[in-house]
Amino acid sequence: MAKTAEPKSKAPTAKTPAAVPRTASKARESARSRRPGTAPAYQHMPAGATFFELSRLMVVGIDSAKGQLIQKAQTSPNGPWPSAWSVIAPGAWVIMTAGLTKDGRVAVVAQPSGTTSLSFVTEDANQIGPIDKWTAPVGIGAPPGAFSYQKLSMARDADGRIEIFLTDNLGRVWWIYQNPDVIVQVQKTITPPGTTTPIVVTVDELRPPAQPWSAWIQLTGQLVAITALRQADGRIALFGINSGLNLYRCQQAKAQALTVADWTPWVQIDAGYPFTEMAPIIGPLGGTNLFAMTQQGQVLHTKQLPAGSDTWTAWATPGYSRVPKYTLCAGIRGDGDIMLVASDQQHVHSFNAQYDAATQNWSGWRDFNASGANTRLSLDYNADGRLALFSMMIQNDGTNGLWTINQMAMDSSEWEWTWTALATSNLKQITVVRDLTPPV
């Protein structure tokens, strides 16, 4: 959604009815593979190597008018977007988040209207044909005493099990997880090699647990926002902001965390700066990186050093912003390096590309587009490694529209000029996920 002033392509502004962004060109380049002789900054993959992952991008959201839980996904890896949204589950919904199951299917946890009990739904494991099928919602209960929820977050743990975190109306932090498989002893009859006499042996086997989900467990702390991230070693890290705009982190102390005691204590890490946004992500060296936005609109950076440890670097800046920024997202480029995208208070979008993780060398903030109103940004990569930027922009009726553009090539500094409209209004909330079980 570019600004209304030329030469940028037009988008809806706060004073005009929502409209599809006007394009400067309808041409779209196909993805280009890395060429020999690329700059040293892009040498994480061999020169000339191509990138491909069997995946497609999907947006899960809630419809503002009917409260429907809906989704829209690329029709194939790197493929186009359909015109219509599809309903995931019947009924009206209040808040949701999405992630992936152990086998790569999209999973959604959401609150149905009229109840505090949350529901869990996944893509059907037996997909046949191009039409997405979803399992029936399964209730996973509600945290005791919760009346509403401020933020939901989902991550897979070291075993691939889904863990869900939330903050409730009182700022309490809650956790629920899929129970691990249990070991049972079974007797089997076998015939040892070189003999003809069967014998009975006892072996250990993994079986699904009797109860699929744990009870709701209250973690320590009081937060208004929380984000969960699976780290390189499989342990989950949590990042949170409280009502005083203080920033905190903690992580699982061991790979299979089942109790509150299996978490490290919360550590306040704001160094006195009030923070409003956070974007944690795993970097190319395996360490967890946290990018966070101060109340003054500057993006700061800290990271684990070494990777997997509980020691972090001092706050640093990947680039100063003359115009304060208000929204931030982080993604991984095809070569494994980090890409940041932010929008400033003049609604100008800029990116900041990591050139070298070891030396923390960055491109600096580079303007590349704009919007006509406040927006929320998300980044994820296509099957060919090109990043896709999603911009959910506020409309005159108080709902949101959603548009997307791609990098012109993997690791490119150029972006498509034409925004693809996924919705021109009527969205309440979205989450972008990478479906690892696309139709092919």
What are these regions (language model features)?
Residues 1-36:
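Intrinsically disordered, polybasic Lys/Arg-rich low-complexity tracts
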